[in-house]
């Protein structure tokens, strides 16, 4: 049992380090020699990179950050599909249950890693893009539905943070409608609450009517990824 727990623990540690890869920070240093955390919203996410460095770096950050979340969940599923890995499980282990639990834990670790990166003194982004990557591998139908809600709200409001919050709030309902396992529903609640909490400053600006829209040039802007 100890070896089995250790193997799963390693998967979760790797998931955290995947999530903590500081894409936006590294692009800021490489392209302009700046610390992206000292500009705009002071976030390493794709929205702040877009506003600070431009479309190309912003899209690159978005793509890599999505892959971080997707990679964390894909790694767990790959491990659980490997007979050598499964030989470490005790004979009475419910593999299906363990898989669901470790998948959601790996997803949460990747999300945490993005927003609290060990490489950046536990700072980072808002975890929206990384969370989307997790969803697309965990349940691609829910991931696409959440992306659709994000796209709809951003097209109507031009406010990225409001779109991210709307998508996060919709997750438990989408998981329930898609009849996903209870573990995935619990993940959607936990991840959704965390993403909304990460947007607390944005919520205050939304209530005050000062949250910038896409295309606006603000000295202090918001980041939703």
From Swiss-Prot:
GO terms for biological process: phospholipid biosynthetic process. GO terms for molecular function: acyl-phosphate glycerol-3-phosphate acyltransferase activity. It is an enzyme of class 2 (transferase). GO terms for cellular component: plasma membrane. Its EC number is 2.3.1.275. The chain crosses the membrane at residues 1-21, 56-76, 95-115, 134-154, 159-178, 182-201. It comes from the Bacteria. Keywords: Cell inner membrane, Cell membrane, Lipid biosynthesis, Lipid metabolism, Membrane, Phospholipid biosynthesis, Phospholipid metabolism, Transferase, Transmembrane, Transmembrane helix. It catalyses: an acyl phosphate + sn-glycerol 3-phosphate = a 1-acyl-sn-glycero-3-phosphate + phosphate. It is found in: Cell inner membrane. Pathway: Lipid metabolism; phospholipid metabolism. Pfam families: G3P_acyltransf (PF02660). It is a multi-pass membrane protein. Catalyzes the transfer of an acyl group from acyl-phosphate (acyl-PO(4)) to glycerol-3-phosphate (G3P) to form lysophosphatidic acid (LPA). This enzyme utilizes acyl-phosphate as fatty acyl donor, but not acyl-CoA or acyl-ACP. PANTHER family: GLYCEROL-3-PHOSPHATE ACYLTRANSFERASE-RELATED, INNER MEMBRANE PROTEIN YGIH. Probably interacts with PlsX. Belongs to the PlsY family. This is Glycerol-3-phosphate acyltransferase. It comes from Acaryochloris marina (strain MBIC 11017).
């Amino acid at each position: 049992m100890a070896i089995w727990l250790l193997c799963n623990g390693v998967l979760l540690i790797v998931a955290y380090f995947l999530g903590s890869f500081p894409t936006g920070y590294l692009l800021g240093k490489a392209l302009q020699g700046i610390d992206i955390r000292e500009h705009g919203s002071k976030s390493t996410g794709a929205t702040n990179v877009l506003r600070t460095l431009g479309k190309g770096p912003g899209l690159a950050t978005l793509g890599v950050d999505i892959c971080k979340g997707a990679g964390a969940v894909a790694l767990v599923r790959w491990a659980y599909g490997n007979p050598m890995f499964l030989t470490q499980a005790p004979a009475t282990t419910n593999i299906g249950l363990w898989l669901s639990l470790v998948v959601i834990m790996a997803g949460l670790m990747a999300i945490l890693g993005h927003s609290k990166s060990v490489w950046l003194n536990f700072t980072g982004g808002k975890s929206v893009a990384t969370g989307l990557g997790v969803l697309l591998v965990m349940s691609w139908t829910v991931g696409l539905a959440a992306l659709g809600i994000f796209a709809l709200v951003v097209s109507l409001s031009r406010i990225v943070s409001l779109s991210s919050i709307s998508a996060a709030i919709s997750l438990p309902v989408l998981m329930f409608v898609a009849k996903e396992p209870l573990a995935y529903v619990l993940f959607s609640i936990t991840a959704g609450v965390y993403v909304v909490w990460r947007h607390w400053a944005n919520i205050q600006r939304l209530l005050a009517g000062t949250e910038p829209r896409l295309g606006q040039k603000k000295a202090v802007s918001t980041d939703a990824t």
